[in-house]
Amino acid sequence: MRFRWNAWNLEHATKHGCTVDEIESVVRNAGRGYPRKLGDGKYLVEGRGTGDRFVEVIFIYSPPQTIYVIHAMPLSRSGR
């Protein structure tokens, strides 16, 4: 599984306190039912991040078979 990082998505994906390692781990260890297709080429994964917190990651494939993360943030208890 390949990830593509650049200045834009690195800043955008980590602005809510998630690390690159945490984001990649959530995607790599996605459970049954993930990734979930959202439309417009976007996919959602939710899973355990660092310290047992739940993290939401949204990504696109760009180029094909390469994950380009566009959003990541910890989920509150009500958001799980």
What residue ranges belong to the model's regions?
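Ribonuclease/tRNase effector modules and their secretory precursors
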Residues: 1-80
